[in-house]
Every structure is written in structure tokens, then in C-alpha cells.
């Protein structure tokens, strides 16, 4: 278990650096003479036509709907593994991160709504600060190496996975519109086929891939966000074959470097380019960026800590072995790194609104996430022993 987590985190730390480079490059291009090239590239129309099927979208939507579906496939595989065999496989193991994740979603959303209540346009962004970027948060923790107890790493991993599960539910319930009955019927048939493959013990990934592609197209056309197709596919792929091998884990290990070193950096590059030339102090302190930044910087750690404390005091959960509240607190701060996940929800929340709102949301996400990363890192570094645990 410890070796697997260390391998996971070693990739995440390198991926975190690459994410920062992608964000910096996007901001540089969006605020330089290259801005036209940057916007033109992301707006390039890409068309796929097979018979009667015709999909044409700007490149940025192929990234957000296509590449991110693969990312959510990976998230789904991780969630399934942890639920069946890992850090969430028993009530005792799952209790604390579950309560922490719930608090870490409710309180930031409440903070955002405090600043945006009454505005029907900006209220749609309530879920933006509720997300945690699992890759970036774990990457920041990985910078502290062996000083971090394994049980603390598992706690953050489990919390982030439950948080991702919550985001999946939020997308399905609140950011799916204009539903198409025909597409939903096709999607349902594809899901039935995937479940049937699982029930029959099929371990070859090819039939899952074919039905998964059909499901993705159907969900894309249905009005439900296409990334949910990735999660459904993941839950249908068997965790264990009869010979003891794991098709699910094999795919997870194959996808992980692609997600870390390609999908998330590309997503960050495509979505983090905020033009700040027309922004002033009044813009920076407007309800959207302030609500998101404070939701991430304050709402997240307060929610995680308060709900965790209540759960422990009521004996509904217990602290991880060898970990006290002084270690949990900085990890709670790290949960405020919303970054790519918050930007993704922002792209859904303000998809049909004035582009200004999307820029403000991304700006608030960047400010809040960077502050959460800095506070979490230096705080955890201060409370941990100097030698490996």
C-alpha cells in the first residue's frame, strides 16, 4: 500500500510542476501579442462525421468534453478500487474522509453564495469552490516526501476521491440541461451492454471501449455532461478477473501518466488563459472571484476541520494512526486547491453566460488555489518532523 501511494505521488509531484508551467504559459499567451493566436487555436472548429453522426465543436470543447471524459474514466477507476479494496472499503476507513469531504463541499458553496445570493447568473457558480484538484493537492504533499505519514497521505487521497465523487453527482444533477430522450435511450442501452459484459466476466477491454465510445457520443448528445460517461465505463470494468489479475488496475496504470502529463496540463493550458488587461481593483473584489477565492482559502479548510471534529467527537469516525489535529489542519488547507476541477465546473456553470463571468471564475480559482497550496505546504512543513516517519 505504501509503495503504491509513493509511486502515485511521485507522478503527481512532477505533474503538478507541469500544471504550473501550463497555467503560466496560458496566462502569458492570453496577455501578450500572442493572445489572438491562443484564442484562435482554442476556437478552431474540429468536425467528426461518420454517416449520419456529425459532431463539430471548437477545440476547447473537445478538450473539456473529450479529454476530460478520459480523466473522469481514471477517477472512476480509482474510486471503484478504493471502494472495493482500498482506503474506502470499510466503514471505519471511510468515515473520516467522508465527513471531511462533505464539509469541504458544503461550506465553500455556502461562502460563495454569501457573496452571490440573489444574482441568478452568478449563483450558478456555487459548486466551483466545492471541488478539490486531486492531482495538484497530492503533488503539493509529495514535495514533503517521506516526512508525511502514510496514513495522512491515505486520508488526503480518500478525501479527494470522495470529493471527486461528489463533483460527479453535482455535474449530473445541476449542470445537465436540454435533455434528449433519444440520446438517453441509446445511452441506457450502452450502459446495459456494459453491465452485461461485466456480469459475464468479460475482461477484454476492447468491447468495453466500443460500447464506451457509443455511450460517450450518446451522453454528449443527450444534454448530460459527457464526462459522466467516463465514470460509468469505469464502474463497469471488472476489478478482478478469475485468474486474480485486474483489468481495471491495468487500465488505471496505463491512463495515469497520460492524465498527469498530457490531459490535465492540456486542460489547464486551454482554460487558465485569463486576459487581465481590462480588470481593475473593482473587478478583483467583485462577488464571483471573491466568493470562489474565499470559498477555497477559508471555506474548504473550515468545512473539512469542523465536520471532521464533529465526527470524531460523536465517535462516528477516528483520526488516522499517528496523526493529530495539527497535521489534519494543513491538509484541510490543501483541499482548497480547486484548480483544474474548479475551472472545469466554472466552464459548465457559465457556459451560456457572458464570457466575463468565466474569466472572473478562473481568476478567483487561480488566486484561491495558489494561496491554499502555499498555506497548506508551509503549514504542513512546519508541523511535520524533519526526518522521515
Swiss-Prot record:
Chief location: membrane
One record GO biological process: regulation of pH
GO annotation, cellular component aspect: plasma membrane
Cleaved signal peptide residues: none
Record has Metal-binding as a keyword: no
Catalyzed reaction equations: Na(+)(in) + 2 H(+)(out) = Na(+)(out) + 2 H(+)(in)
Membrane-spanning ranges: 14-34, 59-79, 95-115, 124-144, 154-174, 177-197, 213-233, 257-277, 292-312, 328-348, 363-383
Protein name: Na(+)/H(+) antiporter NhaA
Molecular function, one GO term: sodium:proton antiporter activity
Keywords (A to Z) from UniProt: Antiport, Cell inner membrane, Cell membrane, Ion transport, Membrane, Sodium, Sodium transport, Transmembrane, Transmembrane helix, Transport
Lineage: Bacteria, Pseudomonadati, Pseudomonadota, Gammaproteobacteria, Alteromonadales
Family in the record: Belongs to the NhaA Na(+)/H(+) (TC 2.A.33) antiporter family.
Task performed by this protein: Na(+)/H(+) antiporter that extrudes sodium in exchange for external protons.
Membrane topology: Multi-pass membrane protein
Classification via Pfam families: Na_H_antiport_1
Keyword presence, Transmembrane: yes
Subcellular localization: Cell inner membrane
